[in-house]
Amino acid sequence: YVRLCMPKAKIAIHQTWAYEQDSHRLNIELGYKNHTDMFEDVRASYEKAAKDIKVDFIIPSGEVFQRLIESGIEKVHRDTFHASYGLGRYALGLLWYSILSGNDVKQNTFCDFDEEISKTEIEKAKECVAELCSI
């Protein structure tokens, strides 16, 4: 319907992320041994969905979380599965801003967070988003 009514519109899907390492949901409810295995399944599912429904691009939110976690920053969840009010939401906001506007996030000065975020975490989030958006 969107393509019929707005043929020039770009259609995207928002990729979700893996649950927090060692959480009940991840290990018991879903049976994963670690968040990396879950993320690999999430990524594959979104790639398949994108192809099946012919979207123009994926907003790689799960990829941002995964990169932050792999860099040693693990405070991206607030309750083992939702984005934290601080770093998680900030990283997602940077990603959406960069993807939708085409602007570089490295000079972004936003700093009104719902939870405290260290300067190191702010810079790491910007770095992860900038790397993803340059691919």
Task: Place the predicted regions along the sequence by residue.
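Conserved catalytic region of serine esterases and O-acyltransferases that act on ester linkages
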Residues: 76, 80-87, 91-135
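Alpha-helical cap/lid subdomain in secreted, periplasmic
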Residues: 1-86, 98
